[in-house]
Amino acid sequence: MSELTSLTIAEAREKLRAKEITAIELTEAYISAIDAANERLNAYVKVTPDLARVMARKSDERIAAGTAGELEGIPLGIKDLFATVGVHTQACSHILDGFEPRYESTVTQNLWDDGAVMLGKLNMDEFAMGSSNETSYYGPVINPWRAEGSNQQLVPGGSSGGSAAAVAAHLCAGATATDTGGSIRQPAAFTGTVGIKPTYGRCSRWGTVAFASSLDQAGPIARDVRDAAILLKSMASVDAKDTTSVDLPVPDYEAVLGQSLKGMKIGIPNEYRVDGMPEEIETLWRQGIAWLKDAGADIVDISLPHTKYALPAYYIVAPAEASSNLARYDGVRYGLRVDGKDIVDMYEKTRAAGFGKEVKRRIMIGTYVLSAGYYDAYYIRAQKVRTLIKRDFELAFDAGVDAILTPATPSSAFGVADENLAADPVKMYLNDIFTVTVNMAGLPGIAVPAGLDQKGLPLGLQLIGKAFDEETLFKTAYVIEQAAGKFTPAKWW
């Protein structure tokens, strides 16, 4: 069975098409793997084995009939932020207890239309607010990686921690995820997987629980660059139900893998050399530069002068949008309801009981910066900074840069229930220091594993591209992957 779960999506696709394996065999292998491991890793909050078997059998029928889709028979995990008809969708929050949508998100519908099989819903930070997957109502996800000679439990990153852990532990062939400030790229870096946040508007947001609507974007987490390319092609589409989705053709991302980087310009931003950055992150960055140089790319220094303002601006804009989006959860129509003496009391008690501490903190921050006395001082200024950040990237790309290379995270994975981070939320927010600029500018960014630190934990590099030029990111990330090799955790679970 483990031989089947070790197949990449590309490998499984070939074996399914050649009828060397069946979709039901592949699906059963993943169901067994989840049964054996989920109690320890807590990657899934809802497993759907019966539904998976039904979908797999239908895939086998289509393969036999010669009408197989692009992802026919491939078992996937779905982040608990995507609406799935009749299946638990709670954004890992108590306030959405028992919610089973009557509609399907556009992203998941695209995957099912291409023949993919749903294994279940994946754990995440509550409402996607977090960088460690510790804010989930269902408890933390445990990273499949451990430091050499240590049994300490590590976080997988967040908010898409369940997606990253499940992919790294081979509990699904690939997974959907979302990224508002780094929630695909940071967990990918922490788990030795590949994660891409596409350009804002590349994937529909319809049917995805909203955190910050101008920043949220769906994307895949996968075992390697090729699998990420295959998944994004299926996930992406224009959608009449989402006016922010863009009507552009979705390229065949897989087709660019292996193309030459000769003559490409890779920008290295000075501002990403932050105080206190570990030497091994700097070394990895230099190694990435050397790999791209060896592949024929030209390396140029660039300046993104407003980078230092990105994190504070992000933590004004994102909570402000969250404060508005989360106002709809009141206990009236769906989810948790705590009775009160009147409707206002019921609202207050429901929201007090239903939201976790981090979500409440961000709602309070958002409500504060939107209040009459502070709107101009905070929110409007943050939006102006956002425009300047976007302009920095535009100037770099206008000067001929094709992609930008940076570290993905300021460190490797840290321990579950880290007291330093628990005591100071700002330290936790600093995990997003290399990733939030990409969301603020609406650009695509990919995290690709590039090495291990001195403790034997994975580290990633990030590539940032021009709007709707994910092809260049895949092509360049593939070169890094070929040079670095792939990384798999030693099995303990």
Curated annotation (Swiss-Prot):
Alphabetized UniProt keyword annotations: ATP-binding, Ligase, Nucleotide-binding, Protein biosynthesis
The keyword Repeat belongs to this UniProt entry's keyword annotation: no
InterPro entries for the chain: Amidase, Amidase_CS, Amidase_dom, AS_sf, GatA
A GO biological process held by the record: translation
Active-site residues, Swiss-Prot/TrEMBL: K79, S159, S183
Catalyzed chemical reaction(s): L-glutamyl-tRNA(Gln) + L-glutamine + ATP + H2O = L-glutaminyl-tRNA(Gln) + L-glutamate + ADP + phosphate + H(+)
SUPFAM superfamilies tied to this protein: Amidase signature (AS) enzymes
EC number: 6.3.5.7
Domain of life according to the entry: Bacteria
GO function term, MF aspect, one: ATP binding
Record GO cellular component, one term: glutamyl-tRNA(Gln) amidotransferase complex
Subunit details: Heterotrimer of A, B and C subunits.
HAMAP family in the record: GatA
Family: Belongs to the amidase family. GatA subfamily.
Function recorded in the entry: Allows the formation of correctly charged Gln-tRNA(Gln) through the transamidation of misacylated Glu-tRNA(Gln) in organisms which lack glutaminyl-tRNA synthetase. The reaction takes place in the presence of glutamine and ATP through an activated gamma-phospho-Glu-tRNA(Gln).
Protein name listed in UniProt: Glutamyl-tRNA(Gln) amidotransferase subunit A
Organism, as annotated: Rhizobium etli (strain ATCC 51251 / DSM 11541 / JCM 21823 / NBRC 15573 / CFN 42)
Lineage per the UniProt record: Bacteria, Pseudomonadati, Pseudomonadota, Alphaproteobacteria, Hyphomicrobiales
